[in-house]
């Protein structure tokens, strides 16, 4: 099963990184204020980056790696990834 690592841009300009095996369902949850406490208080959110991984473990590792990046590096990833 493939997993998706994604980055959202929140209303305040912050970036949220997550992972899911059903991107449409997860985005719907985020936009409804049920996706997580961080995004709930920063609606609306916009999807700005996605990356597919083959397994859950690979997605978890990539999500963690992106979360460790500086904001500048995340913005570069988002800009070059599209």
Where are these regions (language model features)?
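GIY-YIG nuclease catalytic motif and its immediate N-terminal context
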Residues: 1-82
């Amino acid at each position: 099963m493939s997993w998706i690592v994604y980055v959202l841009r929140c209303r305040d300009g912050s970036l949220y990184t997550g992972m899911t095996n059903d991107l449409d369902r997860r985005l719907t949850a985020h936009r409804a204020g049920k996706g997580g406490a961080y995004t709930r208080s920063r609606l609306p959110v916009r999807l700005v980056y996605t990356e597919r991984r083959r397994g859950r473990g690979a997605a978890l590792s990539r999500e963690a790696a992106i979360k460790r990046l500086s904001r500048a590096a995340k913005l570069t990833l988002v800009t070059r990834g599209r």
